[in-house]
């Protein structure tokens, strides 16, 4: 199957595109877009990959589901389009950045600038029905995104994987801690942020690790 995705990712993920589960997933997604309002817009389903080529990835942040409100999701986990009110988790992410490294919250919740520096902002499920959180879970996306994470973890070394909350931590359980830095904490959601997300210093710890391995730090 010919999938429109950035070329270096295509080289690593083509075996997935040729599997039966991905064909079934594609049929499901096409059907959903034809009948319902689905986020993100179809052209942005693989935005995380297109903005952050395989060879440029330095950091991976794993999310769960795209935002399901109008105008929010654009294919990057935790990120929203310019001009959209910051969701609560993103507010808390910016609070932790301020406390950790002193950088003030930006005027936009659009994290494209992180992606362009080598931060793969990957949701486990890449599509969702409007106003129905989790509606596209267990349809095959998780298998595909597992394959993407595995390709990175096996082909590269000295990456930073940031896993907030139990869902992301389970998804990243197979990552070799001897080859990569794996940072875990509570999720930035208001329900859990005070249980270990605040004060995790993941942003400075990421940059310290990158610097120690000869990589440019991320401008958070």
Describe the function of each predicted region.
Residues 1-13:
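Generic N-terminal amphipathic, Lys/Arg-enriched alpha-helix
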Residues 3, 15-160, 168-170, 175, ...:
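A polyanion-binding, active-site-adjacent surface
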Residues 195-197:
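A non-catalytic structural micro-motif
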């Amino acid at each position: 199957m010919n999938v429109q995705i950035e070329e270096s990712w295509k080289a690593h993920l083509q075996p997935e595109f040729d599997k039966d589960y991905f064909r079934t997933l594609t049929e499901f997604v096409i059907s959903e877009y034809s009948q319902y309002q689905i986020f993100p817009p179809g052209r942005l389903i693989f935005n995380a990959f297109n903005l952050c080529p395989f060879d440029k990835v330095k950091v991976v942040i794993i999310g769960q589901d795209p935002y399901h409100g109008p105008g929010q999701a654009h294919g990057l986990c935790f990120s929203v389009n310019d001009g959209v009110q910051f969701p609560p988790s993103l507010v808390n992410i910016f609070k932790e950045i301020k406390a950790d490294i002193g950088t003030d919250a930006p005027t936009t919740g659009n994290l494209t600038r992180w992606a362009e520096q080598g931060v793969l902002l990957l949701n486990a499920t890449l599509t969702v029905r409007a106003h129905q959180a989790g509606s596209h879970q267990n349809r095959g996306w998780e298998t595909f995104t597992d394959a993407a994470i595995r390709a990175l973890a096996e082909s590269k070394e000295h990456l930073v994987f940031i896993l907030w909350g139990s869902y992301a931590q389970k998804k990243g359980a197979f990552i070799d801690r001897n080859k990569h830095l794996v940072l875990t904490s509570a999720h930035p959601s208001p329900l859990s942020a005070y249980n270990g997300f605040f004060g995790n210093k993941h942003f400075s710890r990421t940059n310290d690790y990158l610097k120690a391995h000869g990589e440019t730090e991320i401008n958070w």
